[in-house]
Amino acid sequence: MKNYRLAVDENGSPFVLNSKGSIDFGYITEEMNLSPAPIRVAEGDESYGLAHMVKNHSDQLSQCGFADVPAFVEYVTEHFTTIKEGHTVSYLLEVNEDRNHTLFISLSRTEDYWNVISGGVF
């Protein structure tokens, strides 16, 4: 079995595991007109990833019924119906409900995965 805990992002931050024990939460495919690659979330820091989302959005996500940040990321990556161009080099993945469940993602410098920057319910 592969030890995913050894995998790190381009900043050296370990990737978070999804509920299935994988670092890949979802995928961007060629049909989406973006670079095809898996979607991953790193532990990060205050500016991106899990640490950023826990600090700035975990209360909101809890109020919307999500057990934790990884559960929210998994939900959006499995159910998004809209992709919008964001600021600079980011894109928004959205599940359109009464309020948008949104993830902000950007392609890694190596272009081999999409990194979750932030997200929330807006």
Give residue ranges: language-model regions.
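Ribonuclease/tRNase effector modules and their secretory precursors
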Residues: M1-F122
